[in-house]
Curated annotation (Swiss-Prot):
Its main location: cytoplasm. It is found in: Cytoplasm. This is N-acetyl-gamma-glutamyl-phosphate reductase. It comes from Corynebacterium efficiens (strain DSM 44549 / YS-314 / AJ 12310 / JCM 11189 / NBRC 100395). One of its GO terms (cellular component) is cytoplasm.
Amino acid sequence: MVPMTIKVAVAGASGYAGGEILRLLLGHPAYASGELEIGALTAASTVGSTVAELMPHLPQLADRVIEDTTKEVLAGHDVVFLGLPHGFSAEIANQLGPEVTVIDCAADFRLTNADDWSKFYGSEHAGSWPYGIPEMPGHREQLKGATRVAVPGCFPTGATLALLPAVQADLIEPDISVVSITGVSGAGKKASVPLLGSETMGSLKAYNTSGKHRHTPELTQNLKEVTDKDVTISFTPVLAPLPRGILTTATAPLIDGVTQEQARKVYEDFYVDEPFVLVLPEGVQPQTQNVVGSNMCHVQIEVDTVARKVLVTSAIDNLTKGTGGAAVQCMNLALGFEETAGLPRTGVAP
C-alpha cells in the first residue's frame, strides 16, 4: 500500500545523475501536491555541503545539507534512488527492507549473466532486478509495483531504442555496428585529466573500443530478448566536447527484400503508443540539442540500398532519458503514478 506521503531519498545526490533526479522530482506533480516529499540527500565526498553550494540550479533545496550515505540516514524513506558508483549499490540495497522501493542508477543489477558481470566489472555478481526500459516488450508490466529496479545504462538506452524494432521484426542480420557520441557528463563529476576542458574542447576521441566498454553486454542482452539469432555487436563510444547528449548511429546488414517503406512502418507501429520515443519524419535527423533536458528519444530509420544495410540513428539526453528521467519513469510505474508524470517531452533547442 502506497503511503499518503511518499518520502524519497537520493543517495549520490551531488552527482550528475542525482542532481538530475532532484530536478525532475521538483517538477513532479506529486511533489507540488505534497504527495511526494524529498527527504535525505546523501553522498560521500560532499558531506556537509549545501545544495546551494553544489547545485545552485535547484533553489528549492538550497538550504539542504548533504549527509553521509548510511543505513541510518536512509531509514524511514519509502523510495531510495541510488546514484552511486558501480559496486556500491548492492551493499546499500541489502540494508534496506523489502518495503522500500529501491531504484538503482548504477550497473549492479542490470546484467542477468554472472560471467558477463565478472568479466566487465571484476567483482561478484549481485543478481538482477527488473530492468528499466519500459519500451522493451514485457518490461513495463515487470516495473509496475516493483520494489527493486535497475535503471539502464545511457548507451544501451539510446542503442536499444534505436535497434529493438529492427531486430524483433527481423529487418536485419544482428551483426551490428554501433557508434555513440557522448557528452562528458556521462563520465560523472570526479576530476580526471582526460576530461579537463583543455583535453576535450575542440576534440573527439574514441575510448574503450573493440568490445571493452562495460555497456556492450547490456546492449547485447537487451537485443537477445527479442530474437533467437546470435547477436554480435561492435560498440564504439566517442567522447565529444558537449556537456550532455548521446547521438547513436547503428548499422547492420539488411535482410533481402526489406524496403524503406517496410522498415519505416515497423518503427512507426512499434513506437506509436510510446510517449518518450519519437520516430522523426523522413529526412529529419536526430540531434542532441533537440532532446536536451527532455525524457525523449528521437529516432530515424533508413535503408541504404547501395550498401544493403539499415541505418538507425537516435538521440537522447544521457542525464535524462539516459539516467535520471529513466529513474523517475520507473518510479512512476512502480508506485502507480502516471508514467509521464514530471517528465518533460520538450527539449530546449537551440
